[in-house]
Structures are given as structure tokens and as C-alpha cells.
């Protein structure tokens, strides 16, 4: 008997619809647009994830006896994507692709509320976060940020934010055990382990083993045009720079020629004018003429 594939196809279509609904519900379309924008403009787009995220669903229940409506939120685990700006993405400088990276560092810029909310996420150290909050904001504005924020004329640009570094990569096994990471017996033969660490104000906010099986860096890097000798790709502006310079030169030349071709030509008998006069032409110009 020939097996029927129709039920399997229907199940696959329903699962595909579920995945699309979950991605739309977690702003995945916005994240992907951000990645594509930087890929085209800057040459490289970076997507992080997917991760599992506990989303709060707002729901209300009605008491059958009293008829009162009570707020009863529910938690639901959904996938989540994150767009990482290339300005906040620091890969292994010796790597030419994400597969070649030994480690990756992502920079976060969080306000006090966002940093405090990290206490509610798994494996974050509440005491270290409280200590970091008491130290105050530590964000250092980079030189390129004045151009990104369109504030080139501001001499002292400051941001009241916490600068947090998220590290994904390898760590010496002995150092990991010293830092408090519990290792399984199956890792006794390893010299190094893959970890995830969050650091702010010299405080370790989170330090865990890489949760993925098999272990991998949770970043997807998409260059617009691959540069085989560098990690980051080439975008449209850099790709068309030479052609744009040629077009700009022709435009300037056409304007200069138009200014000359559209100008007036005068024939002046200076013997009829008072000596020492300026020969420039402008509205309201008066030439002093000698009598005769």
C-alpha cells in the first residue's frame, strides 16, 4: 500500500502557520527589517537567536459565584529574535566568518529599569545587579555615536545608560570552575568550555554554560556582498562609491559650465569712465562716466 502524504502535509502547514504567528507576535518582522536595513546600508546584518521567551498573556476570569472579573495573567513560552546592530557587535578580530569565530561580544545599552528587570530572567545574579545599580551609569559614548545621533556640534555628549557586555565563547575549564560553574562528569576530559557571561561595572551579572546543543554561537551574520578577507561585508553605498564620485564630478562640472555659459559679456570703453572704478556687475551698479 502506498503511504499517504496528505496528513503529513497538513500537519506541516499547520506548524508553519504556528511558527509565523509566533514570530509575528514577538516583533520578528521588525527585527528582520532592521537586519536587512543594516545589511544593505552598512554591508552586514546580524540576527541573534532564536531564544525561548516567557511572554505574559493578559487574561481575565469571571467568578461564577460573585460575577466579579479578576485579572489572571498567564505565561507562555514563545520564540524570540533580536536584531544586533553592527555598532554593538564585536566578533573575533582574526575570524572571517561567524563559524570561524572563537568568541563574540555584544554590547548592550540599558537604562535602570531594563537592568533591574534582568533580575527576573533565569540565572542572573540579583546581588551583582543591585551592586551595579548602586555604582551608577557607566556608559562611555564612542566617537562615531555623535554622527549616528546627528550631534556633531555637541562637545560633551553623555548618555545615562549602563554599558553591559555579553560574551559568548570559550573559557578555560579551571577558570570556569573557579568562577562557580558546575561541570558534569562528561566534561572531565575537556580543556575549555563554552560559556555565556554578562559583565557590567566589573560585576559578573550572569555566568552559565552555553545552553545550545550542539554548542554554537547564537548569531547569524548576513553580508550584502562577501569580502573573503574580512568578517564584515560590503554594502550598497561602499559598492557604488566610485560611480557616485564620477557622477558628482560630472554634476559639478555641468553646474560650473552653466555658470560660465549663462554669464554676460561686456565691452567697456574705459576712456569714458572715471579711473579706479570696480568693474564687477551687481544690481543697482552705477558707473561714473567722465564728461565729454
Task: Please give the residue ranges for each predicted region.
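Extended alpha-helical, oligomerization-prone segments that build pores/tubes and scaffolds
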Residues: 1-292
